[in-house]
A protein has these predicted regions:
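Active-site glycine-rich loop that binds ribose-phosphate moieties when present
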Residues: 34-60, 66-73
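Solvent-exposed alpha-helices and their adjacent loops that cap or buttress functional pockets
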Residues: 3-7, 56-59, 78, 126-130
Length: 179
């Protein structure tokens, strides 16, 4: 979703994002693939697409200034960087969501984006960890077995594999190949 992002961008805005796979914050929560994965953990924490893409932006020095989506993803964004402006447009409750009116959502998003872009957006830059340890939990043990053949991947249980690197691009490459 951020494959065209490069250093020429001033900022990254994320609209319509959702909580990480296995989260109860949204019945549609997933990370990259709900049909293949239970969850992804990055350095021991559940990883969302927001986090994966934010780290990709960080490799290029592009700040993540705005996130909208469910309440869970907005809380995660502010945990990663309290300066990221967020707008929660829905809240997951069991197998459903409670959403604000679409016109109100558009209005809040527009106001928040205009506001954050007038501020010092450098405060929204995300610091990358020095090392990355990714755990993938597959729904099917055969997918984990297949993924275990990726160079550097270690199978740690029938459904889970782990990959480590100091280079975030290698993490992205691995995700592209095994998910």
């Amino acid at each position: 979703m951020v494959q065209e992002l490069d250093k020429s961008f001033d900022a990254l805005l994320m609209i319509g994002y959702h909580s990480f796979g296995s989260s109860s914050s949204n019945p549609l929560s997933h990370t990259l693939s709900s049909s293949i994965l239970n969850y992804i953990k990055l350095n021991g924490e559940y990883a969302s697409e927001f986090l994966i893409h934010s780290y990709a932006a960080a490799t290029m020095g592009v700040p993540v200034v705005f996130v909208s989506g469910d309440e869970g993803i907005c809380k995660e964004a502010n945990k990663v960087n309290k300066n990221i402006k967020t707008v929660a447009v829905n809240k997951g409750v069991g197998n459903s969501v409670i959403s604000i009116h679409p016109r109100l959502a558009v209005e809040k998003i527009k106001e928040s984006v205009e506001s954050i872009l007038k501020e010092d957006i450098d405060k929204c830059k995300i610091k990358l960890p020095e090392h990355f340890k990714v755990e993938l939990s597959f729904r099917n043990h055969t997918k984990a077995f297949k993924a275990s053949f990726y160079p550097g991947m270690e199978q740690i249980s029938s459904t889970n594999v782990v990959f480590e690197s100091d280079d975030y691009f290698e993490i992205l490459r691995m995700l592209l190949f095994v998910v």
